[in-house]
């Protein structure tokens, strides 16, 4: 059963059913759209379906490895693409200087920055740390589900615009959990902007639960973040 049907969100279920219906018609009887023109909302969804179908498909698994300084140009390009995406969707996250080259140089030096490569090219990036996160100790409006000493923390994850919609972000989350387990973590924590719908859907899809709110250090921007956690079994 698709995960959306288990969630019980009627609006999401209805949107999923509408998309399924349009995809079937587009595949088997596209002529029906001439007989009964789609509504404006259906047309926008059809345009998105066509864009998704035109995207390249992953034909082999990506490779996850620790990033090196040679990866910096590709990492910074991916971050800029993510920054542009967030700007278009009016999400006040990564809209200032953070994260920048110094941020990722520090991550690389610490051995916490990882990349996913596909057919030899960097396609995604994330940082995974295992030290207690001071900002997370000041969680409000909720509580963590695990103790801080045994939690991994996901930071700065982004996927190349060339590979959005291909499932690469889901593979990234699988690698995050694999690395966390191998390091002995009992949980993975992460935070994101409350308006970052794409990231929140990704987290929910992988079983992360909202735990409360924190304040991040992103000078000149909205510091409020929603915090999520997944217990590793």
Predicted regions and their residues:
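Conserved beta-strand-loop-alpha-helix junction that forms the acyl-donor binding cleft
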Residues: 164, 190-200, 218-219
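Conserved active-site alpha-helix within GNAT-family acetyltransferase domains
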Residues: 170, 182, 194-212
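Conserved GNAT-fold acetyl-CoA-binding loop/helix
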Residues: 83-103
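Conserved GNAT acetyl-CoA-binding A-motif
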Residues: 173, 180-192
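Conserved acetyl-CoA-binding loop-helix of GNAT-fold acetyltransferases
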Residues: 159, 165-178, 201-205
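Conserved acyl-donor/pantetheine-binding loop and adjacent beta-alpha core of acyl/acetyltransferases
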Residues: 127-164, 218-219
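A short beta-loop-alpha structural element at the N-terminal edge
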Residues: 63-77
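Conserved catalytic-core motifs of GNAT/GCN5-like acyltransferases
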Residues: 191, 204-225
């Amino acid at each position: 059963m698709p995960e959306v049907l288990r969630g019980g969100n009627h609006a999401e279920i209805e949107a999923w059913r509408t998309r399924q219906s349009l995809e079937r018609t587009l595949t088997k009887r596209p002529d029906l759209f001439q007989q009964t023109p789609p509504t404006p909302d259906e047309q926008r969804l059809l345009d998105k379906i066509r864009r998704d179908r035109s995207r390249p498909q992953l034909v082999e698994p990506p490779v996850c490895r620790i990033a090196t300084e040679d990866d910096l140009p590709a990492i910074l390009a991916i971050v800029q693409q993510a920054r542009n995406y967030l700007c278009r969707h009016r999400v006040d996250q990564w809209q200032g200087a953070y994260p920048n080259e110094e941020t990722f140089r520090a991550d690389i030096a610490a051995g916490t920055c990882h990349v996913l490569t596909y057919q030899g090219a960097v396609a995604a990036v994330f940082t995974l740390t295992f030290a207690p996160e001071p900002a997370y100790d000041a969680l409000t409006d909720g509580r963590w589900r695990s103790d801080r000493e045994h939690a991994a923390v996901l930071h700065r994850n982004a996927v190349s615009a060339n590979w959005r919609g291909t499932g690469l972000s889901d593979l990234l989350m699988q690698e995050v959990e694999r690395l966390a387990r191998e390091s002995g973590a009992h949980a993975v924590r992460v935070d994101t902007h409350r308006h970052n719908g794409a990231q929140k859907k990704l987290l929910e899809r992988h079983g992360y639960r909202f735990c409360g709110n924190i304040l991040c250090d992103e000078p000149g921007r909205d510091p409020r973040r929603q915090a999520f956690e997944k217990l590793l079994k």
